[in-house]
Amino acid sequence: VPGGDECNINEHRSL
């Protein structure tokens, strides 16, 4: 799912 995974990665990067 392009977007959902990216969103998760972005959130993890923020943390």
From Swiss-Prot:
One of its GO terms (molecular function) is toxin activity. Its EC number is 3.4.21.-. Its main location: secreted. Keywords: Disulfide bond, Fibrinogenolytic toxin, Hemostasis impairing toxin, Hydrolase, Protease, Secreted, Serine protease, Toxin. One of its GO terms (cellular component) is extracellular space. Inhibited by PMSF, bovine aprotinin (APR), and soybean trypsin inhibitor (STI). Is not inhibited by EDTA, beta-mercaptoethanol, and high temperature (85 degrees Celsius). Expressed by the venom gland. Signal peptide: none annotated. It is found in: Secreted. GO terms for biological process: proteolysis. Snake venom serine protease that cleaves fibrinogen Aalpha chain (FGA), partially cleaves Bbeta chain (FGB) and has no activity on gamma chain. Is more potent than A3 alpha-fibrinogenases and less potent than A1. Belongs to the peptidase S1 family. Snake venom subfamily. Monomer. This is Alpha-fibrinogenase A2.
